[in-house]
UniProtKB/Swiss-Prot annotation:
It is an enzyme of class 4 (lyase). The gene is comE. PANTHER family: SULFOPYRUVATE DECARBOXYLASE, SULFOPYRUVATE DECARBOXYLASE SUBUNIT ALPHA. Binds 1 thiamine pyrophosphate per subunit. It catalyses: 3-sulfopyruvate + H(+) = sulfoacetaldehyde + CO2. GO terms for molecular function: sulfopyruvate decarboxylase activity; thiamine pyrophosphate binding. Keywords: Coenzyme M biosynthesis, Decarboxylase, Lyase, Thiamine pyrophosphate. This is Sulfopyruvate decarboxylase subunit beta. SUPFAM superfamilies: Thiamin diphosphate-binding fold (THDP-binding) (SSF52518). It comes from Methanococcus maripaludis (strain DSM 14266 / JCM 13030 / NBRC 101832 / S2 / LL). It comes from the Archaea.
Length: 185
């Protein structure tokens, strides 16, 4: 059975230790904040489609593992990011694409990932990719991706669902300064 985005993020965060995490805009960021708020989490509050690009840029400029959590709708909005990631292949970057075939933060309208296989697209861009469809596959893929160097993409199929979580109680400048201080330590 497919997991929800909240369940996928929760499982990912069970394995995160000191990695940098950049999370997609809207409800996914609120869900991550509820699951495991940490200084090395960057919560996107705007700029749909840029979580993968911000994570990619960080992965090229820091000497630690960077994880970007993105949704299918955001990746579809910025598909060029996959080609750029595939061309530059940072040494420690994981892009987790939660593919629920929906724009979750705006009411679960259907995305074009119903007819566009993001796993195949990321593979075609030259990225070491895996598609997962259940909890066991997700856990195995996350453990593998975090234990190896290189660039990896996990496309986790999910069922559309927005967890009822509170808003992030940090203002954008707080998020930025807290994050910047954490990654320069």
């Amino acid at each position: 059975m497919e997991l929800t985005r909240y369940e996928i993020i929760k499982i990912l965060m069970e394995y995160v230790t000191d990695e940098i995490v950049v999370c997609n805009i809207g409800i996914p960021s609120k869900e991550l904040f509820k699951i495991n708020d940490r200084e090395k989490n960057f919560y996107m509050l705007g700029s749909m489609g840029l979580s993968s690009s911000i994570g990619h840029g960080l992965a090229l400029s820091v000497n630690e593992k960077v994880i970007a959590i993105d949704g299918d709708g955001s990746v579809l909005m910025n598909m060029g990011s996959l080609a750029t990631i595939g061309k530059t292949t940072p040494k420690d970057f994981l892009l987790l694409i939660v593919d629920n075939c929906a724009y979750g933060s705006t009411g679960n309208q259907e995305t074009h990932s119903t007819c566009t296989d993001l796993y195949q697209v990321s593979k075609a861009c030259g990225i070491d990719s895996i598609g997962v469809f259940n909890e066991e596959q997700l856990r195995d893929a996350v453990k593998l991706a975090l234990s190896e160097s290189g660039t990896k993409v996990i496309v986790a199929k999910a069922r559309p669902h927005n967890e009822n979580v509170p808003n992030i109680n940090l203002v954008p400048t707080e998020i930025k300064h807290r994050f910047m201080n954490a990654i320069k330590k």
